[in-house]
Amino acid sequence: MQNKIIIHGARAHNLKNIDVEIPRDKLVVVTGLSGSGKSSLAFDTIYAEGQRRYVESLSAYARQFLGNMEKPDVDSIDGLSPAISIDQKTTSKNPRSTVGTVTEINDYLRLLYARVGTPYCINGHGAITASSAEQIVEQVLALPERTRMQILAPVVRRKKGQHKTVFEKIQKDGYVRVRVDGDIFDVTEVPELSKSKMHNIEVVIDRLVNKDGIRSRLFDSVEAALRLGDGYLMIDTMDGNELLFSEHYSCPVCGFTVPELEPRLFSFNAPFGSCPTCDGLGIKLEVDLDLVVPDPSKSLREGALAPWNPISSNYYPTMLEQAMASFGVDMDTPFEALTEEERDLVLYGSGDREFHFHYVNDFGGERNIDIPFEGVVTNVNRRYHETNSDYTRNVMRGYMNELTCATCHGYRLNDQALCVHVGGEEGTHIGQISELSIADHLQLLEELELTENESTIAKPIVKEIHDRLTFLNNVGLNYLTLSRAAGTLSGGESQRIRLATQIGSNLSGVLYILDEPSIGLHQRDNDRLIESLKKMRDLGNTLIVVEHDEDTMMQADWLIDVGPGAGEFGGEITASGTPKQVAKNKKSITGQYLSGKKFIPVPLERRSGNGRFIEIKGAAQNNLQSLDVRFPLGKFIAVTGVSGSGKSTLVNSILKKAVAQKLNRNADKPGKYHSISGIEHIERLIDIDQSPIGRTPRSNPATYTGVFDDIRDLFAQTNEAKIRGYKKGRFSFNVKGGRCEACSGDGIIKIEMHFLPDVYVPCEVCHGRRYNSETLEVHYKGKNIAEVLDMTVDDALVFFSAIPKIARKIQTIKDVGLGYVTLGQPATTLSGGEAQRMKLASELHKRSTGKSLYILDEPTTGLHTDDIARLLKVLERFVDDGNTVLVIEHNLDVIKSADHIIDLGPEGGDGGGQIVATGTPEEVAQVKESYTGHYLKVKLQQ
């Protein structure tokens, strides 16, 4: 077998016909500037070809289900293995997908509970066991010798009535005695029972004394009792003790029944096990009273009920007024001053009580009717569930929130599944074990107390669970719970979860391609991640990791630097070799940073801010431990801490949502906190994340930053356009008129090929230029609109230098380091880091008020150290204008450049949620308890 992967003539995207050799069974890091072609090499060439060759080997029937693989633009690749890609984009947003289901740990947990779990009665009557007649006989014979007993068959349990037919049937079956409510009677002499009281009736099957030779008689009596008692039987030992037995998993006292224990009972995705109220989601969409009555100081007449404020018709306000008049509720009293009874009437309706409703609509239609009053909450619920209009449903959804299901308390399962415990009655049910952090879960498994028989059954299952949990622990995810929804994980977290699943599969000879697995990881956890990667390599796998993290690069066996620039200035291999060899390479920008020739300097002084603060008191969402936090305004603030310490909860769930609620009237509820002050000092909140700037290829840098409007204005003002009577709209590829109608302005046409990949071909009419020939006859400085869209930002800056309005907007795109992108590049082809910087660019050219708060969650994702240097310059421009920039970040170059650090921790999950250190980087570096401070100290001394 070859010991190298040899690539000849790779041309995907911006790759310039490159040849490269990659050693097999090694940890290989591919690095380079954002947009240099790293992903084009790793994912679009190597992974695409490895995957395609594997799929090609399958039958045509199987291929149709797998989607089709396009052959990458490369001459040849030798030495490939089947490839598995672990990237960031493929996290499931399905609410049924959790950490437990993604890692398959749930499958093993379900098996564990089905095999060694014991059901306990939910009404507190102890363990529920199922016994065969044979087992019951053995237990009875184990009683002390000479024990006197009677065998009873329960036929009525806690039921009202006189039960005359029951006694007739008992007599008919030939039985003589019965026990009614604890007293023994001859079946013909039972006193008349009270109709309105609950009664218990048992048939006396046999009376025995425990001694040798009774087994056969006892067995017959037990079988008869089970038959008559529907699988239940009681042994009364005459000394006041009673033993209850059942052939079913059913409580002999109250009858609570559990089906046979099997894995599907513990699945919240199967109707058999899921909670019937929330269908296994753990949350239920309920009307939120805070959204229905946003301002309780208003009266009903002033519009206290938000859903019924008149928008298009006066129907609901009229109904409300007539109903309140009928039921005697004052429309002018503030809502909060109404009595509880009156508020209930307004919210939940009048029940059966009716009022007379008379209404005439705008078209003369009339209603004259006596009806019950529905109540606003009931009305919102009904309209949400019954409407056929998406618009109405969305409006009603605005008054609802997802609340924890009251039936299953968020555990997602039904009572029958949640009554099964492992480790005795004081043990845990499957819902509780899923709520534990992975670190606590591991500890619980180690302390699990099982009988010898249970241990034998559980050993292989527990080993599988333990291994998978250990992998999650080793990649820095010890703070997650198995019940955590997969959709709420960050890109780095979901990638490391899939990494743990792959390590658990113990495959060898596979080619793994990873996309920045260190994202969202604190330096402290990075070493464990690198160890995990080395473990995968040592199993005999090849790992190709696209990464910018210096530690990972230095620990790699082989380093490939793609560059030298980005976009059309990249696409070449600038250096390839061991990390030490690359560090000595003068052509490699990465090498210059690794050797310390280039570095991001520490700012000479820290800003003092404007003296104002946003202060949050009592932040207690998720693992935050009732924090009081001050965010100084007019500064560059970094929120730091190990993974899972509560950074995103504090910034995204509380601060961002609370500010958005006050400034933008956002309906999204912030997390739990006591109070927030200082929002009046800011006017705008700008959240700059890495989500795509457009979902379709029609969105591009020119349309997103707004510069395309100005360019179209410019073309409309040319003499040729004026002569032809073309307005600005003529130069849009989104509307009829100027665009090519053959491809609707897309420039490409999709041809479906069924068993072969869909083929995208340039439109034959416009040849990919999007516009019709008449539009393209209008020129500005010798270029038509299609040629302008094909220009890179750098070229466009020179071309439009004489028009300040356009040049200013294009300059901002260059300032964020995207000079290599073309103005018309489809938004769908931009990476997360590029999309984020495009958002920054569109903010840069807006007039600054100096009162904006910018929030960025890990802005360095996908960025090379050289890109980070540029990003910092842009962020500092915002702060120099008097604005506040708040970043959640692990990158030490960014952290050391901040004016103020808020470090959370000390650990992740339950061990976090506290403030470990605050202050300038120099101050935080002195705090011994701070992991961030420890790494920062080294960085500041470099």
UniProtKB/Swiss-Prot annotation:
UniProt keyword annotations, A-Z: ATP-binding, Cytoplasm, DNA damage, DNA excision, DNA repair, DNA-binding, Excision nuclease, Metal-binding, Nucleotide-binding, Repeat, SOS response, Zinc, Zinc-finger
GO-annotated cellular components: cytoplasm; excinuclease repair complex
ZnF (C4-type) residues: 251-278, 740-766
Major localization class: cytoplasm
CDD domains: ABC_UvrA_I (cd03270), ABC_UvrA_II (cd03271)
KW ATP-binding (keyword) present: yes
UniProt KW Kinase keyword: no
Subcellular location as annotated: Cytoplasm
GO biological process, one term: nucleotide-excision repair
Residues reported in the UniProt entry to bind ATP: 32-39, 641-648
Every ABC transporter domain range: 308-589, 609-937
PROSITE patterns assigned to the protein according to its UniProt record, in alphabetical order: ABC_TRANSPORTER_1, ABC_TRANSPORTER_2
Pfam families referenced in this protein's UniProt entry, alphabetically: UvrA_DNA-bind, UvrA_inter
GO molecular function, one term: ATP hydrolysis activity
Subunit structure as annotated in this protein's UniProt entry: Forms a heterotetramer with UvrB during the search for lesions.
HAMAP family found in the cross-reference section: UvrA
Reported function: The UvrABC repair system catalyzes the recognition and processing of DNA lesions. UvrA is an ATPase and a DNA-binding protein. A damage recognition complex composed of 2 UvrA and 2 UvrB subunits scans DNA for abnormalities. When the presence of a lesion has been verified by UvrB, the UvrA molecules dissociate.
Family, similarity comment: Belongs to the ABC transporter superfamily. UvrA family.
Protein's name in the database: UvrABC system protein A
Taxonomic lineage of the native organism: Bacteria, Bacillati, Bacillota, Bacilli, Lactobacillales
Gene: uvrA
